[in-house]
Amino acid sequence: MKVQRPNRRQTVLGVTVLAAIGIVFMGTQTRPFEGQWARLTGADPDRRIVVSLDDRRLWLLQGRDTIFTAPVAVGSGQTFEFNGRTYRFETPRGTRRVLARADDPNWTPPDWHYYEKAALRSLTPVHIEPGEEYPLSDGSHLEVRGEDVGRVNQYGNFYAWTPGMELIFDGKIYIPPFGTRQRMVPNVLGPHKLVLGDGYLIHGVHDLNETSIGSAASHGCIRMNNDDLRYLYALVATGTRVDIF
């Protein structure tokens, strides 16, 4: 397992970082709210995650001590405009909490994921709605049955579409509804995820984006090497404070 222990520069930088956000030189004393949250969630009130967007680095702290540090990828800061709406892909600064943890997570893409695909390939996005049929040029059609989006042939046979594969037909990209298996993409978030709320995660990498670590490259999530994430995940409970600056 690749564990990155902090070197002197990273430790000094970490102290500077913590001082800047007001959580160093306080010893192990915690605010009343911190203690209440810890009792409710089981999180250690003196343990927290700090992320520097400029340095693209994460620290796990126990009081004043740095337990672990690792490089991360953060939001690119780029904007994307589609159908009169602007999306900005940045990691928001501020204080959050680890709201949930999950092993072997699937990714549920937001609408902008499909809009990006549509813009890149000059496709028309179509949102699939339960109870509707979407005819295709070969005589088949798409529809929702239970938790699946699938293709129905001329004989009425239903074939569920493979999760993670885009539904692209006849110059259109069909967007599966939330709650269907086809809206969930496997094997792109690494071995674990830490949920920070509002769609933001700390997660791992797919083989295709391993080289992004240490850069501003994500759509807003904090991305780590998978070995680093495994180490962090084992030490972080639901309710842990996350300071992003």
Task: Identify the meaning behind each predicted range.
Residues 1-245:
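N-terminal pre-domains immediately preceding structured catalytic cores
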